[in-house]
Amino acid sequence: MTAQEVRLCGLLLQEHFGDVVENVGTHLIRNGVLTLRALAHETKLALDLVKKSLCVLVQHGMCTFGPGRRGPAGPVEYHINCEHILHMLRYPRYIYTAKSLYGDTGELIVEEILQRGQMTMSSTVKTVADRLTHNMPEGQSMDYNEVVSAFSRLVETHFLQRCPPMASAESSGTGSAETPPAVTQPSNPESHPDCYKLPYISLSGHGKRRRSSEDGEADQRAAKKAKTDSSECGDEGIHWQVNFERFHLHFRDQAIISAVSCKLDQTSGEIVRTMLRMSEVTTSANAAFTQALSANEIFRALPSNYNIARPILDQYLTLLVDDPMEFVGKAGDSGGGMFVVNLHRALANLARATLESVVQERFGSRSARIFRLLLRKRHLEQKQVEDFAMIPAKEAKEMLYTLLSENLVQLQEIPKTPDHAPSRTFYLYAVNQLPTARLLLQHCYKTVGNLIERRLYETKENKRLLEKSQRIEAILASLQATGAEATQLTEVEEMITAPERQQLESLRHHINKLDSGENQVDETIFLLESYINSTQASR
């Protein structure tokens, strides 16, 4: 873990769970595997607080545990999962994807499970149905069966998966009271055979509408009833979590489709979308290529609203194969031709375009021209860079040294003689894409950390004004629910003065820009992480 990743993990833990969980989490990140006693001693926190913090982290899949160095008889040791902590950056994106694919019901299902880490199916269905009913007009309610249907579709498409069961020693009677049973946590949920098997639940009815006076107590009652509800419905002990890997595959596919559509046209993007959809079940997460598909299969699987004749499809496939970006490759000639989507090559090209864009934005179009030239030609001397890029010697020298100082370009010395004399040495400039992508990834982590810190600072500085605004909004909602007159509502609204209202609008505008910036930088982070992981897997 780099310093920027540790800092970002700490900020995310603090924002979502508070200072105590952030203290425990960052201590585990810095010190690796620790026992409960060691963690409480080193953080100087009460043992009860450390236990609760670990429960929160385990509940959200950010901490794993298992037998320690002394074996099953020794104390349990805890290990933090930094990758899952960083996934919190993408929570808005996961929720938006669920909404775009499965509507408001899918959105609320994913939101509830992300908020609580893991939930039973019956508890999720009831909570989501209640929330949807609360937003419906009087006299309408959400049927549980509709929520169950949306939940089932999310499981069938692997966006939700069962939490792996705890593997513990069966017998409490065989061991002594002083020796607790060994408990281990499976690292891979998909190793469990029932990972995507839906339980049969006896659940019928409609969502209940909450009144404004009940809102404060609703969450407490829901937490107390969760176990009772799940045991009554028949899914006690079967908890579900969000499958981040499946969402990431969807994001990767969408990035590839978008790139093809921008480079060629919408029809080409739809053909690639069809190929990715057909092979998403048969292609592993780290595969460099999708499974080979024949032109006949692709033609039959195209959406009916795309009236593409077979000869036109063959022309599009030929165009995709011949394109320099190499998103699609040809793997054979049977069945009208066998085609694959080159996933690794697509991610490499997307990462390369990102690097070029960053260089252009920071250093200008001429520096970007030099950067692209080095990416294409591999190794060049300074004189060759000047000639190929058609840039004056002085400017080219300054730009190369600027890129070199930022570690975006590397300099390699190749001596002609053993004495390494400068006059008898070749100095070659080059761009190594993988280390450069790693460097940019660290810059992105730092940028997101800065954005979060700035947002927290803005919120803290205007805490009084935000609390006042929330109180007034609550009063207005209560008055509207009781059918108050317009004059009463106007009086309450005037409790916020014009300067305060202007300051509040400005604050919300800044917060929205910071949130938008976080999401945009996270898209770059995801692209670079996918490229780095794909490159490592292909070696």
From Swiss-Prot:
GO terms for cellular component: RNA polymerase III complex. GO terms for molecular function: single-stranded DNA binding. It comes from the Eukaryota. DNA-dependent RNA polymerase catalyzes the transcription of DNA into RNA using the four ribonucleoside triphosphates as substrates. Specific core component of RNA polymerase III which synthesizes small RNAs, such as 5S rRNA and tRNAs. Residues 167-179 have a biased composition (Low complexity). Belongs to the eukaryotic RPC3/POLR3C RNA polymerase subunit family. Residues 165-234 are annotated as: Disordered. The keyword Oxidoreductase does not apply. One of its GO terms (biological process) is DNA-templated transcription. InterPro entries: POLR3C_WHD, RNA_pol_III_RPC82-rel_HTH, RNA_pol_III_Rpc82_C, RPC3, WH-like_DNA-bd_sf. This is DNA-directed RNA polymerase III subunit RPC3. It is found in: Nucleus. Keywords: DNA-directed RNA polymerase, Nucleus, Transcription. Component of the RNA polymerase III (Pol III) complex consisting of 17 subunits. Residues 212-230 have a biased composition (Basic and acidic residues).
